[in-house]
Every structure is written in C-alpha cells, then in structure tokens.
Amino acid sequence: MIHFIIGGARSGKSSYAESLAKNSGSDVIYIATAQAYDDEMQERIQQHKHQRPSQWSTFEEPIEISDVINNKSSSTNCLLIDCLTLWVTNLLCENKSIDDCKQQLIDALSNAKGDIILVSNETGMGVVPMGKLTRRYCDEAGWLHQEIAALADQVVLMVAGIPVIIKPISSNHQHKS
C-alpha cells in the first residue's frame, strides 16, 4: 500500500508518517533524502534521527531512491521516504534528468511490495515564484505530486498537525505481497 503524506513546513508530516510506519507491523526502513549543506540542516537531520526508533534501518540516499525501493521493498518491510521535495532539490542541484528519475521512481513504486510511505512538502499553495529556478522547482514538485497522488492508495494533507484525508483507502484495495 502506498501512503502519500503532504503538507506545509512544520505541519506534522514526518511525525504522522512515522506513526503510520510504527503501526504498520513491518520492519521499517527509513530512506532519508536530506543533505546537510549547513549547520541548521545538520541539526534538523540529527533531530529527526533521534526521534526515530533505534530498530529502524536508515538509508541516506539523496538521489537514487528508486534503487533503494527496488532492493528493499518486500511484504515484511515498510519503507518511509522523507522527503520528495528535498529529492527534487537534489536532482536540480546535480543537474539530473528529473523526468528520467521521476519515471524510475514511479516504476519502482508501481512494482513495490509491502507498505510505502512518502512524505513531501506542498509547494503549490502560494504565489507563483519570481525566480526561474524556484518556479521550475515548484513546477517539478507539483507534477511529481500529481503522479504520486494518482498512484497512491491514500493521500493525506497535514494541516497544523491534523491529518486531512484527501484520498481515502479504497475498500477494494488489494495489498501486494
């Protein structure tokens, strides 16, 4: 089952996703896309690490998240990927083909087994950014979010720590194993 958790900064996305993972009954593999470019980001990363249960496996993968999904998804694992917008940032910074990487991610998710929880920042609820790179970032994130939401079994919008279900789990959902 694919859960897509989206919301603004400090909306409770990661906490909610971690709660879903804890309650999955599966072995949790945390896939972190963040890179520490400054002290503040390093502190955020450390804070997230300390909040996670020690028995969770962690993979720090800023670019090739589809490879981790392909190699680690199973009926006994729950993969938690946090977060897709940082992944888009990493792709832009590394001048990677976003379309190719996005397709690899969609393919990996389509073939994944077990539970997958994806976290991302909603970037499309504000004004259109003035800068070219920022506009591209928001566009790429928005297009990715649309594809992930279409593929996901459940989509949750986090607002002030409250989960708002915008795509409920279908009653005819069949779990892949």
What are these regions (language model features)?
Residues 2-71:
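Conserved P-loop
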Residues 54-101:
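Helix-adjacent hinge/juxtasegments
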Residues 1, 75-78, 112-119:
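Loop/turn-to-beta-strand initiation segments
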Residues 25, 51-53, 74, 111-113, ...:
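Short, well-ordered coil/turn elements that cap or connect secondary structure elements
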Residues 17, 48, 80, 121, ...:
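Residue-level signal for inorganic ion chemistry
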Residues 12, 36-43, 75, 79, ...:
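Residues at secondary-structure transition points
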Residues 28, 79, 154-157:
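Short, well-ordered beta-strand core segments
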